[in-house]
Amino acid sequence: MDAHYTGNKITELRKSKNWTRKDIAEKLHVSVAAVSKWERGLNFPDLSLMEPLSEILEISVSELLGLENESADQV
């Protein structure tokens, strides 16, 4: 797992929905600073937030974490 990959994915999907960091923060009941840290690859979202985050971004947790790409690369 790569925090920068996940952060870039969150940013990409957020922007594709024309959402701000504040929008994501409000949906997940976290601070804007937390979302900023995720997007910059400084932290991962808390495990309890992975599923709700993936649901609002309309992506699987595996895709959000880059796990599907890793398994494809290993084949």
Residue ranges and their predicted role:
Residues 48-63:
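DNA major-groove recognition helix of helix-turn-helix/homeodomain DNA-binding modules
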Residues 2, 20, 31-34, 46, ...:
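Short coil turns linking two alpha-helices in DNA-binding domains
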Residues 66-75:
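Short, charged recognition helix plus adjacent turn
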Residues 30, 40, 69:
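Short, conserved catalytic or interaction motifs in soluble domains
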Residues 1-16:
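A short, Lys/Arg-rich alpha-helix, primarily the initiator
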Residues 18-37, 52:
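Short alpha-helical DNA-recognition segment
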